[in-house]
Amino acid sequence: MMDTKTKLLGLIGHPVDHSFSPIMHNTAIEDLGINYVYLAFDVSEENLKNVVSGAKALQITGFNVTIPHKINIMKYLDEIDEDAKAIGAVNTVKIENGKAIGYNTDGIGAKRTLEEKAGILIDKNILIIGSGGASRAVCFELAKDNNLTIINRNIEKAKILSEEFSKKLKKQKPINYGDLDLDIKNFDIILNTTPVGMHPNTNVDPVIPLKNIKKDAVVMDLIYNPIEPVFLKEAIKYGAKTINGLGMLVYQGAVSFEIWTGMKPDIYVMKKAINSKIRL
């Protein structure tokens, strides 16, 4: 039960009504028996600055940042973790000693989720679709030990991101880039980081056709609502192993939770909470 000592955590983005983060985090909070609550807030771009100053004034413990604010939130923060700074996007903010500090846990979440189905990720040929905030985090984490290609509807954005991370990570083999017509037959892993197919706009075509994928390819979509987005339905038709965004949501959320509270939540409890929501 909330009282005057309850600490507030939250999620900001637009939209947020589809999010499973509140039930996931609140279940973890209840499991640990700590006095916190996690709420979702639909925030427009013009109110981002006010959100950060308000969070500091109200002594909110911290909040997650989702689409479309992961990049623009950075200019309103007091400090940014070195990895988040290199990524160029923030998905987690902690308010500490009156300062808003930004972190990024998306890349770690994506990597841990992929490794559950694809094994250790070393020297894999990976195709990343999209160049937004989530893409930046995933690229930064996966490019360290693998061969990446980034594609985007706007090829110039893909080029800028590939060149930026090739330089930051001192890649001997530069990150490749292309447009949405790139031949996909040689990729071990294909990962969609765009919101194409996300609730409520689910009646759309897949972001790229998948008929030429490798026989044993792993296809991941960061979308988790719907559970089986159109991109994964397409992948299943061609025999691919598929992963939706639920695992990443849990793993990145667990790292965020630890940043805020100093406590490790139970991953199983968080997954179970989401699965119970899905069945409703």
UniProtKB/Swiss-Prot annotation:
It comes from Methanococcus maripaludis (strain C7 / ATCC BAA-1331). Pathway: Metabolic intermediate biosynthesis; chorismate biosynthesis; chorismate from D-erythrose 4-phosphate and phosphoenolpyruvate: step 4/7. It catalyses: shikimate + NADP(+) = 3-dehydroshikimate + NADPH + H(+). Transmembrane segments: none annotated. This is Shikimate dehydrogenase (NADP(+)). Involved in the biosynthesis of the chorismate, which leads to the biosynthesis of aromatic amino acids. Catalyzes the reversible NADPH linked reduction of 3-dehydroshikimate (DHSA) to yield shikimate (SA). NADP(+) binds at residues 82, 130-134, 222, 245. One of its GO terms (biological process) is chorismate biosynthetic process. Shikimate binds at residues 19-21, 66, 91, 106, 224. Homodimer. It comes from the Archaea.
